[in-house]
């Protein structure tokens, strides 16, 4: 039966792709125009198309609420790279079968591919009863004993109970509320049900975006996102991917069951390649669509180029950001094979609690205060701009607050005087400002830095990587090494030179290839070239969020004690926080000349000025009142001497 293209798309189950369509009634345009704005617009009756995908071409956004001072706002296109963050509003329209859910919602192995629903009534299974309103997580769609089933799970008392539901399972299934925050790209790829709109709340917007903000000023409200789709496919005798708008006025017939799809190009995306088993590599492929903005030699990934894909694997990268006061900051993924060398640069700490996290057993943390703090209690130390401290460990101490004894968490330090040291207790709730004093002049390769020091860590390239033509890291004023992450890569080479290989990231490099043949392995070793990859703000945000979610975040810094709190509550809170804080070695008193470098005993103004120069080198643009005050302090000290 012939359908309009729009009707076909509406009824399409994405799990059944690819599909083969025959044009029943074509559309013709005068002249020789076969493509407009990147989309096919001319087909002849009888032509056959293999549909390989349905992608969102653009998003139309509509503001739901009336904005004071604004006229009625028309729907507008929201760019795919819009750097906003959104919270999803649960769809109030129920799904009536599990089959309807799987046909319209993305379910997959990704972190984002596990949607949650609840049912209006109890669901009685063989060994389990799913209660009314209980959250059901959908994990995957699998074939079990010849029947397609949805693998589900419920969580009860910190235990997960798994079960399967058939596609025929009926009832009213509603989306659960979702408290997570998403980028527009994540919503487009995973969270917009097919044939439905998606209501979201805008929660944040990056002011680093250099395009015009499409929203009214200070808008943080509710939007309806409407996807505009495009069909992707291939045709016989053509070596490119065609794109068709569903609104194209043609009639089609699905002939998948009666047509040999092998007549068409067998196209694979980077994600498809990574899903292949390791035993299927190496393979020879032809590049059909090349990635945009790739940093590999231009001759390798060009349409029509034959390449070898040797293997897939996970590789380690160091996520780093440029240190600078103005935006936008640049972000990089640095391979551990990077051959340049780094020197340490001073870190900045906004609170005493940050000092507690940053201290290490390897060496004493030496800092200079950039902000004054007046202690309200005799037992706790006040801080002046320019004061220097050696940080030891966290403790608890009792203070009197309006006659009531209260326990507070403190950081035990030693204040550095001209020729001696003085014990100091800094409350962890102290919102001060500190800059690290660096005495280590050694040059480190990145692998040694990550082994010896705790991230995040500030560095500057001191010796560029001479094995690459242009070292982008060498031009940066300074870098903060933030996290060690693991990412997915394919190892590829030019077919004409299979021993010189390059790593390409699966998630950030979109490429389409045609499978040509298998490749016979040679015993000859690979020369693997890894590149420093510059990533976008959105990619950086997603990496930080996902990597950080894998480990428990550190406890929040203790709050300033309030008089209204009871003694019991304070003691309990102090005990809890003391347990949560990282353990550190006991404070010990050492001779002054052994605490620091031999030539730095006494800490005259030269050391401090040297530290200040490090900061100036790292960020010349900065105009920091605290740093200026330190410089004045150093100047006065020198004058007095």
From Swiss-Prot:
Its main location: cytoplasm. This is Protein THEMIS. Residues 1-259 are annotated as: CABIT 1. The modification Phosphoserine is found at residue 584. One of its GO terms (cellular component) is cell-cell junction. The keyword Phosphoprotein applies. GO terms for biological process: adaptive immune response; negative T cell selection; positive T cell selection; T cell receptor signaling pathway. It comes from the Eukaryota. Interacts with PLCG1, ITK, GRB2, and LAT. It is found in: Cytoplasm; Nucleus. Plays a central role in late thymocyte development by controlling both positive and negative T-cell selection. Required to sustain and/or integrate signals required for proper lineage commitment and maturation of T-cells. Regulates T-cell development through T-cell antigen receptor (TCR) signaling and in particular through the regulation of calcium influx and phosphorylation of Erk. The keyword Hydrolase does not apply. Residues 614-641 are annotated as: Disordered. Residues 260-518 are annotated as: CABIT 2. Phosphorylated on Tyr residues quickly after TCR stimulation. Keywords: Adaptive immunity, Cytoplasm, Developmental protein, Immunity, Nucleus, Phosphoprotein. InterPro entries: CABIT_dom, THEMIS.
């Amino acid at each position: 039966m012939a359908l309009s293209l729009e009707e076909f798309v509406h009824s399409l189950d994405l799990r059944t792709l690819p599909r083969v369509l025959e044009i029943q009634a074509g559309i013709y345009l005068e002249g020789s125009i076969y493509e407009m704005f990147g989309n096919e617009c001319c087909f002849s009756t009888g032509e056959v198309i293999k549909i390989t995908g349905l992608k969102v071409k653009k998003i139309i956004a509509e503001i739901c609420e009336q904005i004071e001072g604004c006229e009625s706002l028309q729907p507008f296109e929201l760019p795919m790279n819009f750097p906003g963050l959104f919270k999803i509003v649960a769809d109030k329209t129920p799904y009536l079968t599990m089959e309807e859910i799987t046909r319209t919602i993305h379910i997959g192995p990704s972190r984002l591919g596990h949607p949650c629903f609840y049912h209006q009534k109890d669901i009685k299974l063989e060994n389990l009863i799913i209660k009314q309103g209980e959250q059901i997580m959908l994990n995957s769609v699998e074939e079990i004993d010849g029947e397609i089933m949805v693998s589900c799970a419920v969580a009860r008392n910190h235990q997960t109970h798994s079960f399967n539901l058939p596609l025929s399972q009926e009832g009213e299934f509603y989306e659960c509320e979702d408290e997570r925050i998403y980028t527009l790209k994540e919503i487009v790829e995973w969270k917009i049900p097919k044939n439905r709109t998606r209501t979201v709340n805008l929660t944040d917007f990056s002011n680093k975006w250099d395009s015009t903000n499409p929203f009214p000023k200070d808008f943080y409200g509710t939007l309806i996102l409407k996807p505009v789709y495009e069909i992707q496919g291939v045709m016989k005798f053509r070596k490119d991917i065609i794109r068709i708008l569903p609104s194209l006025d043609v009639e089609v017939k699905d002939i998948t069951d009666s047509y040999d799809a092998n007549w068409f190009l067998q196209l694979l995306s980077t994600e498809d390649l990574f899903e292949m088993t390791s035993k299927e590599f190496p393979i020879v492929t032809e590049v059909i669509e090349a990635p945009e903005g790739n940093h590999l030699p231009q001759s390798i990934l060009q349409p029509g180029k034959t390449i070898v894909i040797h293997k897939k694997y996970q590789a380690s990268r160091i996520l780093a950001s440029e240190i600078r006061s103005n935006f936008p900051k640049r972000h990089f993924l640095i391979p551990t094979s990077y051959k340049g060398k780094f020197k340490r640069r001073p870190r900045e700490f906004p609170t005493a609690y940050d000092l507690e996290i940053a201290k290490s057993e390897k060496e004493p943390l030496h800092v200079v205060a950039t902000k004054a703090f007046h202690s309200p209690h005799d037992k706790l130390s006040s801080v002046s701009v320019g004061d220097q401290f050696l940080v030891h460990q966290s403790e608890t101490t009792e203070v009197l607050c309006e006659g009531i004894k209260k326990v507070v968490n403190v950081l035990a330090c030693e204040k550095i005087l001209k020729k001696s040291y003085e014990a100091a207790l800094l409350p962890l709730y102290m919102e001060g400002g500190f800059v690290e004093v660096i005495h280590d002049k050694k040059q480190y390769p990145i692998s040694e830095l990550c082994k010896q020091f705790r991230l995040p860590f500030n560095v500057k390239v001191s010796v560029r990587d001479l094995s690459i033509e242009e070292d982008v890291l060498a031009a940066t004023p300074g870098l903060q090494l933030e996290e060690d992450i693991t990412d997915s890569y394919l190892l590829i080479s030019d077919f004409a030179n299979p021993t010189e290989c390059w790593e390409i990231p699966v998630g950030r490099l979109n490429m389409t290839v045609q499978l040509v043949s298998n490749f016979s392995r040679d015993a000859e070793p690979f020369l693997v070239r890894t590149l420093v990859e510059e990533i976008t703000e959105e990619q950086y945000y997603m990496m930080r969020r996902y990597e950080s979610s894998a480990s428990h975040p550190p406890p929040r810094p203790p709050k300033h004690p309030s008089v209204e709190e009871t003694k019991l509550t304070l003691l309990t809170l102090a005990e809890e926080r003391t347990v949560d804080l990282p353990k550190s070695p006991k404070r010990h008193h050492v001779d002054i000349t052994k605490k620091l470098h031999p030539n730095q005993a006494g800490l005259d103004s030269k050391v401090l000025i040297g530290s200040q120069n490090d900061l100036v080198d790292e960020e010349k643009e900065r105009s920091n009142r605290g740093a200026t005050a330190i410089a004045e302090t150093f100047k006065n000290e020198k004058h007095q001497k």
